[in-house]
Amino acid sequence: MAKEKFERTKPHVNVGTIGHVDHGKTTLTAAITTILSKKFGGEAKDYSQIDSAPEEKARGITINTAHVEYETETRHYAHVDCPGHADYVKNMITGAAQMDGAILVCSAADGPMPQTREHILLSRQVGVPYIIVYLNKADLVDDAELLELVEMEVRDLLSSYDFPGDDTPIVTGSARLALEGDQSEMGEPSIFRLADALDSYIPTPERAIDKPFLLPIEDVFSISGRGTVVTGRVERGIVKVGEELEIVGLKDTVKTTCTGVEMFRKLLDQGQAGDNVGVLLRGTKREDVERGQVLAKPGTITPHTKFEASVYVLSKDEGGRHTPFFANYRPQFYFRTTDVTGAISLAEGVEMVMPGDNVEIKVELIAPIAMEEGLRFAIREGGRTVGAGVVAKIIA
């Protein structure tokens, strides 16, 4: 029989499991794939397959992540699970796995623990928009009042980080029982309840192509008789011939007009998210544009120099610094396609930052970058990556 073509008829949503070590994230991931594959097709993955997560690199940082896929009645999900706490921090900060929603796994027997809190905070800082809770190991709790207490604790914790704790779906169950095929409420049915919560609570994400046009400029050429061409990969949206655009970052924002789009030496009438294109600009001089700026739909992105960020500083073993850094440390910040020097200030009471730390910092760049909350960057010293970060809040 011919290999079936991958039919992308259902909308695609990216999710992942978060939560404290040993609360059952990987067991739950195995249970979801196993149980949903029986009903909707797809591939079941067992615990050991997920736990032996392969290494991958994102922004010069090595991360262990397991990727699984599953289907529900209405959607196709791509799901990430990380073996260690440090992998979660790195994954979420580098944006290696952008999540449209997260499944917070919390053991009903233990209640919220330090990493439960840390992962919720991280989700808030890196812009994970929705969290659903799976209260795991509920089969080990005999007292219904105790379950209610843990549920209240989790809701309060979510609310304290500006998630809607009172409205968050909480599914109570046992991933282990579900994996063993148990048909009680705690077993397989809890996985179907979780799938329903995912389907109904996380809205279908806006596709990259439907967002406002943005292209990080990688190179600039001058074509005699035609004008200036900028090249790069369209990050989001669509650009059409004849549209007015803005060039943002590094200098004052200027307006320009797209007079042509080229891909593989062919002229097109438009370029869209994912395309590597050359965009011909009218009335723009070659020397007015440079790598590191962005070409964008007018009014959709602005240049900034000051921001708050959540960063992960590479450990010595990961090829990072061997020594701590202090306030006023001035590395380069690599945004999209270029490095910009900036000065770091630390939170009050924080004397220094050690390699391997995950901290909140404030940054002031020497030149403005087209920026929005959620933008990822690398921290570099002389071309070597020493950290990764995400813009949590723009100051100026």
From Swiss-Prot:
Residues 19-26 are annotated as: G1. It is an enzyme of class 3 (hydrolase). The keyword Magnesium applies. SUPFAM superfamilies: EF-Tu/eEF-1alpha/eIF2-gamma C-terminal domain (SSF50465), P-loop containing nucleoside triphosphate hydrolases (SSF52540), Translation proteins (SSF50447). InterPro entries: EF-Tu_GTP-bd, EF-Tu_GTPase, EFTu-like_2, EFTU_2, G_TR_CS, P-loop_NTPase, Small_GTP-bd, T_Tr_GTP-bd_dom. Monomer. Belongs to the TRAFAC class translation factor GTPase superfamily. Classic translation factor GTPase family. EF-Tu/EF-1A subfamily. This is Elongation factor Tu. The gene is tuf1.
